[in-house]
């Protein structure tokens, strides 16, 4: 039986709980060392093409296309192992797991992420986040379009959405209104992009890093209004 909660906390993964910019930097270093700068650049060109087509980052799908251009290079066959066996747990932000534990005293914490059906679940599992969230994991293509499904699995009177992308936070705020409190950890390249910061409305709560969520009292998530900064 599904329980109606007073409050549910929804967490993004990449650059919210886990330093995905560092993962990409490590991948770029591996590609440059293994294949050279030119082919490294080509991988990321394909990556962006695939992202535009699908609407999410697809590292393994990019690898499939990269392989077609390097069919006779057996080193390509090792790339999937590098990706799938990457030590994602080493990239969890300091204080992230404590922050998740902190908010769970008031309601369940749920991962709400975008991505493919293989690599993104592997990242969540291998990083230890799947266990930290007790298996409460939702991964979509466009999560901001799946709020009805979120409500079906985790019905609540109010939600808190923690994400490094203001576009996502703005879209969810427009859909749920005062039922959601948006939290913006200023981590990763999207959170520092001047154009993005100028284009979208600020979140209800802004954090310099995800660990600061542990400083937030319950009232920060349940009171009307916004504009708070912590600590």
Task: Label each region the model flagged.
Residues 1-5, 126-161, 165-231:
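Asp-based, Mg2+/Mn2+-dependent phosphohydrolase catalytic module
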Residues 17, 109, 161:
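Conserved SAM-binding loop
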Residues 1-45, 68-69:
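Active-site neighborhood of HAD-like aspartate-dependent phosphohydrolases
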Residues 100-110, 114-138:
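Substrate-recognition/cap helix-loop segment adjacent to the acidic, metal-dependent catalytic center
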Residues 16, 23, 117-118, 167, ...:
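Conserved Rossmann-like nucleotide-cofactor binding loop
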Residues 60-61, 81-111, 144-148:
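Short, acidic loop-to-helix structural element flanking the phosphoryl-transfer center
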